[in-house]
Amino acid sequence: MIDIKFLRENPDVVKENIKKKFQDKKLPLVDEVIELDAKSRAAKQEADDLRAKRNQLSKQIGGLMKEGKKQEAEAVKAQVAEFAERLTELEEQEKTYAEQVTKDMMMIPNMIDPSVPIGPDDSCNVEIEKFGEPVVPDFEIPYHTDIMNRFDGIDLDAAGKVAGNGFYYLMGDIARLHSAVISYARDFMIDRGFTYCVPPFMIRSNVVTGVMSFEEMDAMMYKIEGEDLYLIGTSEHSMIGKFIDTINEEEKLPYTLTSYSPCFRKEKGAHGIEERGVYRIHQFEKQEMIVVCKPEESKMWYDKLWQNTVDLFRSMDIPVRTLECCSGDLADLKVKSCDVEAWSPRQKKYFEVGSCSNLSDAQARRLKIRVKGADGTKYFAHTLNNTVVAPPRMLIAFLENNLNEDGSVNIPTVLQPYMGGKTKLTPKH
């Protein structure tokens, strides 16, 4: 959510930003906000003036009564009563206008960074850099579930009976590999100075609307029936929510947290659920990282965050690349975002395994996450988030890039301590 003062002073700039995000249907919101905001402020000003007059008249009543001027005092009382009725009307008007302004403001996208490429969708995302040499072996790479089945490592049929499409059972060495990756990612981030956190796996609606747009909320979140609770789609939401309604001392920033959590997503929309596999599913596990920092430091932290993911994947011998997300591919609260993609030898192309985002003060403004400077000045913090690793997708990249012709899978050195010292996984059939 952008600063309403900025919108008042720069309506054309805000409209141009909406156009750059190819959301022209939202253009009328800018004029509506300006109109309603003016009405809200006018109602407030009139109410403030009336209160001042009411207070002045109220003081006269006591004096008139002492002077025995009861009739004049009663006349003043009647005038004060009229003010009270009008004040109630004005307060209700101000509240109604302000609530609609807030709703409209939450629909207006954040101002994108000038460096963001302009384009309507992810087909216009721009490659930034490649890390590691993509390799295509001279033997056929099976589909990832077929590789897992060689180790008796996945059961989609049983999961379908228990929970429906979009769920899975991981078994044996594949399940152990899944846990090993999470444990390694946790220690990797702790070694980089992040504080490990196990957050709530459910959040209230005020946190949901504070961290994401309504469109994202509708497409992702599962609501608990009869409760003001949602299952998290990613732990960044509950980690950022930790700072709701806080004033943080400037010298204590930045806060850098990393967390493990299960994640639950409806995956409603264009992509939907994958029929057979673990690429796009309703439930998965993820190691996440977030930063709450001073505004002038958010660009620096943005580069550090995505580099963490690149370094993690490269340490497991997986080639990756980074893509700059174009304007139309950015969620409404994001100022700038890049995807980290891993190489798929089977498909001979890269696929998304993580996303890094700078949200500037959008989440902080909604959640009232403020910073108190050394001089006592208060301002909104900046928030960022990034995927460390999401094992279901990472397992696809891992198995394909470490598969041998005989069906065995090499275990990179960094994971061996988490796999009981194993250097290789041998298929059962």
Sequence positions of predicted segments:
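N-terminal alpha-helical targeting/anchoring segments
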Residues: 1-134, 149, 153
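TRNA-recognition modules of translation machinery and tRNA-sensing kinases, especially anticodon-binding
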Residues: 27, 130-429
